[in-house]
Amino acid sequence: MDQLPELVPFLLEPKSEIKLLALQHLLGVSDNQEARDILKSTQIINNCIKLITDSNHVVVRHALTILINLCQDTDMLNDIVKKNIVPRLVDGTTDTKNKMSEIFAMLLSNVTHTKEGCLSLMQCGKELEAFFIMKLVQVLTMDSNQEDYFKSTKNNWIVNIILNVTQIQEGRKIVLDKENQIFKEILPLVRHENVIKRRGILGIIRNCCYSEQHHDYLISPEVDILTKLCLPIRGNDKLDDDDLVGLHIDLHNSSLPIGNERDQDRECRKMVVESLIFLTGTKKGRVSMRTAKIYPILRNLFNFETEEELRDNVEKVVELIIRDEEGDPTPEEIEQMNKKQKLEDEDAQFETDEI
């Protein structure tokens, strides 16, 4: 272990065979915290960043993987973020001819686990504001007309990156900007067959529903977030005629595809309900839920669920939407109901969950 620092200068050796030997050895230990502690005082981060543009694909892969492993150490992750690496990672992720785009995306996902990494990606207040995130969304949705669009496992890491940036206020503001249409473009992916992608998209929706200042946009006909959220929890229950009155046509019995099923993933259903809870935080949100007549959907979901936590959360939403307007809860009551669903905001410690 003590000899590890001596290997770092060889990463910039002109001879590929020597460079690869050093990379292979450092790659083998970069997942070990003891090794990372020893390497902190070296130029390993700077040297590996220089190698991600190397002409040798094996060199690039090893360098990226080492950096990904180093991200497990908070100090080294913060150091990587400070190196202005985001533009290069975005280029590598969005280059459709790049066979290692997924590895670039993995590292970018790690970088955006920090608020500073997210701000670097967002370019808030700068000339390139939203440019990088829009490039990522363009790649994510570029195959939307293909038959396998809702089956493909490509670009899962891009979803995770967007999920990370919506953990902060600045990120939500850009993702929900009406002009760039990011939120609307990714919404259809709630129907994706891949559970990792569905979890990511629903996590993004949940984070965005947390921003009460954006509720008007979310519940507007332009977005119609309530219908989008109800589709994964609709199931194939046949609703009575009385239940269908006022319900969006997409949720009617006749509109459901044959064999339609409620999302089988507990985490997906949980995030749908958490999103609805956040939407009850504003009067317009509660009124919109009453107008949308989503009670039958929630009633059937409540009967479907077996876990107490999920049933309790569904019940919270139902309690709010069936009240008469003059009996609306006080802000204190809503805060009490929402306290378990509280997300980290820009002034809180920045954390994010894997999808």
UniProtKB/Swiss-Prot annotation:
It comes from Dictyostelium discoideum. InterPro entries: ARM-like, ARM-type_fold, Hgh1, Protein_HGH1_C, Protein_HGH1_N. Residues 325-335, 344-355 have a biased composition (Acidic residues). This is Protein HGH1 homolog. Gene3D superfamilies: Leucine-rich Repeat Variant (1.25.10.10). Pfam families: DUF383 (PF04063), DUF384 (PF04064). Residues 324-355 are annotated as: Disordered. Belongs to the HGH1 family.
